[in-house]
Amino acid sequence: MGEVFKMDGLASTILEVHKPAKLEDIPDEDPIAIILALKWLEYLCERAGVENVSDILDFYYMLGWLGDKALAKLLKFLKGIKVDEENVVEGSGKLNITDHIISLLFIERLNGKKISAELLDKIEWELRKIKKGAEQFYGI
């Protein structure tokens, strides 16, 4: 009676408690949040093409950046978006690191966090430092 079972790695991963996503929902009553969400989707469409955005959003969901409600609303908004082909960046339909960072900034802003010019400068400085370190390390 009252046996304790120890879970191995796979079982604990499967039964892992759901952690809240960075963005759980986009409030319907907040027009600024809706505008930001639409501008973010427009950005993603222009960077990767409309046909690839649902895969990108699914990727963010798998990372824990988006919750169920936020993902559902973004996909609903996406159905009504048309982007002029002349604004779409030619490429593989995938995003680069900078694009993912910008997406994360949109998510933080949708959560009500202010993104100051100082914060953006600090992020840019950190990225330059990392890039310089990688160039020195890998001899690029």
UniProtKB/Swiss-Prot annotation:
Name listed for the protein in its UniProt record: Putative flagella-related protein E
Family as reported in the entry's similarity comment: To M.voltae FlaE, also to FlaD.
Keywords: Archaeal flagellum
Listed GO biological process terms: archaeal or bacterial-type flagellum-dependent cell motility
A GO cellular component annotation in the UniProt record: archaeal-type flagellum
Subcellular localization, as worded in the UniProt entry: Archaeal flagellum
